[in-house]
Structure formats: structure tokens, C-alpha cells
């Protein structure tokens, strides 16, 4: 079987209206991929930068997959969004903070329900990933 190692980090994020940021992340693959080691989802710590507009996390990513077929790709810069609540929730968010949250993150990955989400664009998250492939020449 072909093997894929992903070693890197979630560097940080910029372009968000607030400075106190964390990142909840996940790697989702097709049925041909199997995770051998590492965590396929997680959450960074919160960073509140004292200077500048970049929140730094340096959150490590270390994954080892095996696959029977080739599919998928990776991104280095990820644009982000957040749920957009009702106008009452938006006003409350302005004065109190917080904001609407998804009841279940599974709605993001199913195309049938995703079209009902109302979202607003936010900043970008930067990743540095090193990819090591083994036995891909056999497939």
C-alpha cells in the first residue's frame, strides 16, 4: 500500500476582526485512506497578540496515512468563515461578544445540509506542511 506522511504545523491566522483566536481543525479523507498514526482533528490554544494582527499557534501536525488509491489534495492557505446568526444575535455579539455556534460540526461535511448554512467570510489560516510519500510509484 502507498503511504503518506504529513508533518508540519498550523502557523497562525490573520485578517479576523477580533485578535483573540483559536483554530478547531480536522483532516477529512475519502474511503481509500486509512489513518495509521496521529490525530485527524484537534484544537489550538488561544492566542491574543499584544502587537500586530497575526495570531501565532505553531500547532504541530503529524499524520501517517495509507491508501489503496490516489485522491485528494492539500492546501497551504485556508480561507475561513463563521456562522451568521439572526440580526438579534448579531447585535448581541457586537455588545456582549461570543456568537452563534454550530450544534454539530458534521453539517459542514454533508452536502445535503450545508446549503442551509448562513455564513460570513473571515480571515485566513496558514499551514506549513511537509509531505513524504512512500510506495506511490506502485499505484
PLM feature spans:
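Eukaryotic Ser/Thr- and acidic-rich low-complexity regulatory segments
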Residues: 1-139
